[in-house]
Amino acid sequence: MACKCAAGLILLLTVWAKQKKQMFEIWREKRDVFQLIMFGIFGMAFCQLSYYVAVETSNAGTATVLQYTAPIIIMLYVSVRNKKVPQRIEMLALVLAVGGTFLLATHGNITNLAISTETLVWGLASAVAMALYNLIPGELMKKFGTFNVIGWGMLIGGIFLCVFIKPWHVIGMWDIYTVLAMAAVILVGTILSFTTYMEGVRLIGASKASLFASVEPVTATFMTVVFMGAAFQFVDFIGLAGILGAVLMLSLLKKE
């Protein structure tokens, strides 16, 4: 929560330094304000909160599989809104991405999915929130810029979570390592990751961007192998191939 607020303030200061007037233009129209608040609360804040609660009530693999059903929700919504059936290559890419995520998260063993009613509710809620995170800010970013929208969204989401979670009650020891770790989370894990992804949403649309984001479990798997010494199983290679195949298909589709 504190990271979100800090990251939001840094982004807004960047916007203020370059274009002071544009920073507050987003608050002029009621419709824009409503979308921004919905994005900050349900897109930014609730997306992460629901995912971590799903992890807490089950495990990371189960929560990841449930959250990455979001591309299905996004593709269905975009199809209905545009009154257009997705292309076959898009549907195949969707199957490969979701299937690949399932294999990486569970290693192909369905018994690794610990799904209680509570987990199912929070996991699907995180998928819906992830879809909203992709769909809500599209028009806002085109009008006001990615940095401006993400900055306000992070600040709103961070304040919203602070009201309920109260991070200032958390007791911890601050040393140089804590400061460096916090700086890395804010600069790389929050500002860089969120802004680059949302710029991708602005450029290619929510449906394709959410499928490209399926590369995240691939990266997480490699990090686990490199830094934690986890074994990379054969089924993981199949999941990896499925996700990368989906990304390649979408890349070729974009070129066409």
Model-derived segments and their meaning:
Residues 9-12, 74-76, 80, 111-168:
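Transmembrane alpha-helical segments that form core, pore/gating elements
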Residues 1-2, 26-32, 91, 106-129, ...:
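Juxtamembrane helix-entry segments on the extracytoplasmic side of multipass membrane proteins
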Residues 5-12, 72, 98, 155-159, ...:
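Small-residue-rich packing faces within the transmembrane alpha-helices of Major Facilitator Superfamily
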Residues 12, 37, 86-108, 161, ...:
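Hydrophobic transmembrane alpha-helices of multi-pass small-molecule transport proteins
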